[in-house]
Design a protein with these regions (language model features):
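Acidic, low-complexity glycine/serine/threonine-rich segments
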Residues: 1-159
Length: 159
């Protein structure tokens, strides 16, 4: 189980919340069942991408639209525990933005520096990626972009 802080960022649920949940669930359990409530792991991410804008479009304006769309895609309300990240779907979402000719690069990396406010949970994104799908760990975890203003970085490429 996880909770939100005042900025709608994920955090571990406090013991009172877990105890209340345990009491509520105990009304529905069988006599031999046990209720074990654990915190999920928060894996903080950063996203880097590059786009080529269509001729006649302002690169910076198109880039800002792409960043806004990524913020929307990674809004924490849209995600569930143990949901994989399908990079192809994200690239398609960016490709569909008006003014984007193509997405040149799209990469996701782990942000785990506790001193910078991240969860401290390191996750090897490269090893967990197969066929452009980032799979979560077997332990309950959720992917989060904690600071969208700085964790989503894009650039315009021209040839």
């Amino acid at each position: 189980v996880l909770a939100y802080n005042k900025d709608k960022q994920l955090t571990n649920a406090n013991s009172v919340t877990k105890e209340n949940l345990r009491n509520y669930l105990s009304m529905f359990r069988m006599l031999t069942d046990a209720v074990n409530i654990k915190n999920g792991f928060i894996v903080n991410l950063g996203v880097d991408f590059s786009i080529i804008p269509l001729p006649g479009y302002q690169g910076k304006a198109v880039l800002l639209k792409c960043i806004a769309r990524l913020k929307q895609i990674f809004k924490i309300d849209q995600w569930q525990m143990n949901e994989p990240i399908i990079l192809g779907n994200i690239a398609t979402e960016l490709d569909e933005i008006e003014g984007v000719q193509t997405v040149v690069e799209l990469s996701v990396h782990c942000k785990h520096d506790k001193a910078s406010g991240y969860s401290g949970n390191y996750y090897d994104i490269q090893s967990a990626t197969k066929n452009k799908i980032i799979y979560p760990s077997q332990d309950p975890c959720i992917f989060e972009i904690k600071y969208p203003q700085s964790d989503i970085r894009g650039k315009v490429v021209t040839f």
